[in-house]
Amino acid sequence: MSNVRANRVGEQMKKELSDIFMRELKDPRIEFVTVTGVDVTGDLQQANVYITVLGDDEQKEATLAGLSKAKGFIRSEIGKRIRLRKTPELFFHFDESIEYGNRIEKLLQDINRDGE
């Protein structure tokens, strides 16, 4: 039962985080951030937020620094928008799955070109 609730809270947090990043945060380091997923623990105490950033590694690190600096504000906004007893602690991670998928797709295209 709690797993279903954690999934619902994660989906709602994903929507709210996207809205917060787009409308509320004015930090130029956090301009090109996309929230790809949110995993909330069963006790709703922690949330792992997976993001992608448009840009190179330097911009990714700057974005992560900006997010960690704004973590308190983001958490308070989540607390205002989602009615929970305690707002989950946020941990930001880069979602490498999109880059990994693009790399595999490129390798498959190279194999197809070599086979022709």
Curated annotation (Swiss-Prot):
Sorted alphabetically, the keyword list is: Cytoplasm, Ribosome biogenesis
Q: Name one GO cellular component term.
A: cytosol
Classification via InterPro entries: KH_dom-like_a/b, RbfA, RbfA_dom_sf, Ribosome-bd_factorA_CS
Q: Which Gene Ontology molecular function entries are recorded, alphabetically? A: ribosomal small subunit binding
Compartment(s) of residence: Cytoplasm
Q: Which domain of life is it from?
A: Bacteria
* A GO BP annotation: maturation of SSU-rRNA
Please provide an example of a Pfam family that matches this protein in its UniProt record.
RBFA
NCBIfam families xref list: rbfA
Similarity comment: Belongs to the RbfA family.
Which purpose does this protein serve, as stated in its record? Answer: One of several proteins that assist in the late maturation steps of the functional core of the 30S ribosomal subunit. Associates with free 30S ribosomal subunits (but not with 30S subunits that are part of 70S ribosomes or polysomes). Required for efficient processing of 16S rRNA. May interact with the 5'-terminal helix region of 16S rRNA.
Q: How does it assemble?
A: Monomer. Binds 30S ribosomal subunits, but not 50S ribosomal subunits or 70S ribosomes.
What is this protein identified as?
Answer: Ribosome-binding factor A
Its source organism is: Halalkalibacterium halodurans (strain ATCC BAA-125 / DSM 18197 / FERM 7344 / JCM 9153 / C-125)
